[in-house]
Amino acid sequence: MSGHDAIAASVGEEPRALWRHLDLGRCDPVRAQAFVESVAESVAAGEVPNTLVTAQPNAPYVSLGFHQSFSEEIDEGFLARRRVPVLRRVEGGGTTWLDPDQWFYQLAYREEDGGPGGPADLVRFLRAPVAAARLLGLSAELRAPSDLVVGDRKVSGNAGGDWAGAHILVGGVLGRADHRAMSDLLKLPHPAIRPIVREEIERRVTSWEAETGSLPAYAAWRDHLVEAFRAQGLFRSRPGRPTPSEETRFRTETTARHEDPSWRELPPAAKAPGPVVRRLRIAGPHGLLVLSATGTDRLGVAVVHGATVREAYAVGPPAGREGARRLAEGTDEFAEIARAVANDPGFA
Amino acid sequence: MSSAPPRVPPGAGVCAIGPDLWYRPEADGTVVVGLTDAAQRRAGALAHYRGPLPGRSFRAGEPALSLESEKWVGHLGLPVDGTVVATNPAAETDPGTINRDPYGAGWLYRMRPRVPADLEARRGPVL
């Protein structure tokens, strides 16, 4: 009995649903990220079955969550140095660095025969990427609703959205993690905050290679994933090709949308009054809050787990690494930051 | 998921429209639209709300606004053809308002239907 068969036996009956599998392989970032948007329209129209897409971007890029602000999120100096595109996805979540060392899976499905959409679908469908990873030697688990983790460290981020009458779930596995790019791309209000961000990213984000010492071939991972969706009782799939209308829509509508500066630079969301000037979610409940200190030119930085402050720093005014001073727990400054964090909606 | 009951029950004249929305007619011919309590519970704690642009006209169902919870984005349309008159700034600034008070302070937007009778045709039960 293969590993997948053992899983299938434990899960129960063979799934009846038959989906299409589109393997885009290595392709440019717009296609790797957004072809699924074109697919979703075909799925919603009933022209094609619910569809699993797999892909690997052939170049690095930055992906903004649908509600993220380009002007507030991205360091323009980083973009000028690295010359990478920034694409806004239609799904949720935060700003992410994506590159050829990451493998993507995307689902486009109808409500009536795929699932109701929403966070519960993330939990249900992510059983398959977890199972595929485990069969290939990576001891991943789901940290509900949307992260795959090894221990407490994130190895895969996932998100979803409703688009054009269908639901889309997107995710990726970190084969290798470029922690420096992940931290350098973020716009920060003071340079002394960047080392704190990088250290927290290194602490909270891992990769397949870091955990196992090697990387499976993309094709092996893809095949295990396809089989895991079946073995987990979710759906069977049959290899397919994009339809002419999907290709046309992708060229004429999807690509045009992603190349339109007004799509990339959607206006930032209104902000609630309060001391938090920057909120950075790193992985699950882990993140950083940057706070202004009333009446001073200093900033406070809280490294948080949910609403609990694990570390706190006073930052500024000198530029450079010297600008950050770690605060001892029990001091008035630490307590002031902890109070502000407790009153913040955090990463709700 | 938000399990607390809404703090403010629906007021007089609030009707369901579609599976997720309610509306309340105003004296000037506009209607206020919001998310039903059941819909906000299904969505869970809302992290983002981007309202429709005031002054812009939309066809029914055309994506006009978005809500996000737990990394899932819902792109919603207006229930009928019409023009957006106002978006609720309090809900944009603090989307948790929609969870806490879906029939009151957490309203989403105010719109003027192109054909008022369309609302009546799609009207669900009084809430």
Residue ranges and their predicted role:
Chain A
Residues 188, 196, 297-326:
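Intrinsically disordered, low-complexity regulatory segments enriched in Ser/Thr/Pro
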Residues 70-71, 111, 318-319:
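Short, surface-exposed beta-strand-loop junctions and turns on beta-sheet-rich folds
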Residues 83-103:
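Glycine/serine-rich anion-binding loops at beta->alpha junctions
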Residues 96, 100-221, 225-228, 253, ...:
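Catalytic beta-strand/loop module used to bind and position nucleotide/cofactor moieties
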Residues 2-73, 77, 89, 189, ...:
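Active-site loop/lid in soluble adenylation, ligation, and acyl-transfer enzymes
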Residues 47-51, 58-60, 81-84, 100-101, ...:
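Short coil/turn connectors at secondary-structure junctions
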Residues 89-95, 113-116, 325-326:
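A short glycine/serine-rich beta->alpha loop
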Residues 41-43, 52, 75-76, 94-96, ...:
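A generic local secondary-structure boundary/capping motif
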